[in-house]
UniProtKB/Swiss-Prot annotation:
Family as reported in the entry's similarity comment: Belongs to the alpha-IPM synthase/homocitrate synthase family. LeuA type 1 subfamily.
Keywords assigned by UniProt, alphabetized: Amino-acid biosynthesis, Branched-chain amino acid biosynthesis, Cytoplasm, Leucine biosynthesis, Manganese, Metal-binding, Transferase
Record-level GO BP terms: L-leucine biosynthetic process
HAMAP family reported in the protein's UniProt record: LeuA_type1
Cofactor: Mn(2+)
Cellular-component GO terms for this entry: cytosol
Species lineage: Bacteria, Pseudomonadati, Pseudomonadota, Betaproteobacteria, Burkholderiales
Location(s), subcellular: Cytoplasm
Annotated segments matching region Regulatory domain: 394-512
Designated name of the protein: 2-isopropylmalate synthase
Length: 512
């Protein structure tokens, strides 16, 4: 009889800590719904006590997602725990995730606490949390670099107080697979009550081994939960990649002997959604979800695949959501065909009004572009989903003029708090002129630290997807915009980033 491996997704919490990856409430809700369609077991929706905005995000996700356990991170203190429990009240199934550093370095330099003080705080915080909720996870932060004797003492105590999941993080990505797997196994063997909790792994990718370490924690250490993110999103070099660990366990069931509840056909839709929302482009050679993941350039390989797919393919592209039919719709396609394709791509719009608005944009795109690809549709609905009436800035139209030897001129019409304004400027190029035209009214003072363009599909007709990263007063945000006209896509991306900066500033102001 096989065991089940629990998939704990932390894209919305740990993944969002990647510089520029901050998401709005509506963007988080859309990703949470996709994670639910993916059949993720546990969704870490945020850190409820960190801000009013995060509290509202966790609460909103708990209200709408009913088929996954919703989790909030909390420091090991009564205030954080109470705040997280309050945000999780609407959840069908909720989990409190408590963390407290246990390595000598963190206790001395960060917490400025003695080991005995940390031990008591860990024990009492779990006791307090257990009075509020039955499902309690405890993470000894920097656990892999902690003294094993002290770690055993802490973990035994928190299990006695009611912790149901023990997560051992490799917080700085220092571990090596065999050593990490043995570390988990030794803890489980030494702690008398280790069988009273599910053991979990949480690995960072600083040395490029987050997935390998996680799998070693499962196979060697006996862990039955993996904490991971879509596309491996996360601070520094990222986290364990959900799609990679899931497909490794599923493809090599002969080795791992574990069941997994993930609907793998939703993996690609989740990857694209996270990429388009955050502006972090997936590298072409990324395992499972990269554009080249199932491409065969070698003539020998192509011949083998045509004769028998399993000569060079260990998993089927369609099993993770890739479609063999790339060209899907055109200008004569109707609303029902458009709606059906959205469903096939795993996209759920909020209402019929949203579908109608997206369809109008689709028809406009089809008038300008003869062949509409899946990537075009996903970019289009992503643009539609991040445009809301309550946003400070909204794109309306753009015109620009340039001749060889002259500075380009641009005129951008956009909304500020619902009112249309017109900005005009020249610049070093049409993009520069357009963004300067926006700044004639906004005067954000933000510094652009990244500007990148990605072709959504592979032709000169392709839509361009532009990512703009802005930095202001210590806040870093990404904005994403798409359009067949790169200048228009740039203006949309810039306004998107400005909206996120405004949203962050509003949250800070609300907290006083």
């Amino acid at each position: 009889m096989t065991d089940k491996l629990i998939i704990f997704d932390t894209t919305l919490r740990d993944g969002e800590q990647s510089p520029g990856a901050s998401m709005t409430r509506d963007e988080k809700l859309r990703i949470a719904r996709q994670l639910e369609r993916l059949k993720v077991d546990v969704i870490e929706a945020g850190f409820a006590a960190s801000s009013n905005g995060d509290f509202e995000c966790v609460k909103a996700i708990a209200e709408v997602v009913k088929d996954s356990t919703i989790c909030s991170l909390a420091r090991a203190n009564d205030r954080d725990i109470s705040r997280a429990a309050e945000a999780l009240k609407p959840a069908n199934s909720g989990r409190l995730h408590l963390f407290l550093a246990t390595s000598a370095l963190h206790m001395e330099k960060k917490l400025r606490m003695t080991p005995d003080q940390v031990f008591e705080q860990a024990r009492l915080s779990v006791r307090f949390a257990r009075n509020l909720m039955a499902d309690i996870e405890f993470s000894p932060e920097d656990g892999y670099r902690s003294d094993p004797d002290f770690l055993c003492r802490v973990i035994e105590a928190v299990i006695n107080e009611g912790a149901t999941t023990i997560n051992v993080p490799d917080t700085v990505g220092y571990a090596i697979p065999e050593l990490y797997g043995n570390f988990i196994r030794n803890l489980r063997e030494r702690i008398p009550n280790s069988d009273k909790a599910v053991w979990s792994v949480h690995c960072h990718n600083d040395l490029g081994m987050a997935v390998a370490n996680s799998l070693a924690g499962v196979k060697i250490g006996g862990a039955r939960q993996v904490e991971c993110t879509i596309n491996g999103l996360g601070e520094r070099a990222g986290n364990c990649s959900l799609e990679e660990v899931v497909m490794a366990v599923k493809t090599r069931k002969d080795y791992f002997g574990l069941d997994i509840g993930i609907d793998t056909q939703q993996i690609l839709a989740a990857s694209r959604l996270v990429s388009q929302t955050t502006g972090f482009v997936v590298q072409p050679n990324k395992a499972v979800v990269g554009a080249n993941a199932f491409a065969h350039a070698s003539g020998i390989h192509q011949d083998g695949v045509l004769k028998a797919r399993d000569t060079y393919e260990i998993m089927r592209a369609e099993d993770v959501g890739w479609s063999a039919n790339k060209i899907v719709l055109g200008k004569l396609s109707g609303r029902n065909a458009f709606k059906q394709r959205l469903q096939e791509l795993g996209v759920a719009m909020e209402s019929e009004t949203d579908i109608n608005n997206a369809f109008i944009k689709f028809k406009d795109l089809a008038d300008r572009k003869s062949e509409i690809f899946d990537e075009d549709i996903l970019a289009l609905v992503s643009d539609e989903s991040v445009t809301h009436s309550n946003e400070q800035y909204g794109f309306v139209s753009l015109s620009q003029h340039s001749e060889t030897g002259e500075r380009p001129q641009a005129c951008v019409i956009f909304t500020v708090a619902g009112k249309e304004v017109k900005g005009e400027s020249d610049g070093n190029g049409p993009v520069d002129a357009s963004l300067k035209a926006i700044e004639t009214h906004v005067k954000s003072g933000a510094e652009m630290v990244l500007y990148s363009v990605n072709a959504i599909s592979g032709s000169t007709e392709s839509q361009g997807e532009v990512t703009v990263r802005l930095q202001n007063s210590g806040r870093v945000v990404n904005g994403v915009g798409s359009d067949p006209d790169i200048v228009v896509a740039s203006a949309k991306a810039y306004l998107s980033a400005l909206n996120k900066l405004q949203s962050k500033a509003d949250r800070v102001a609300a907290q006083g």
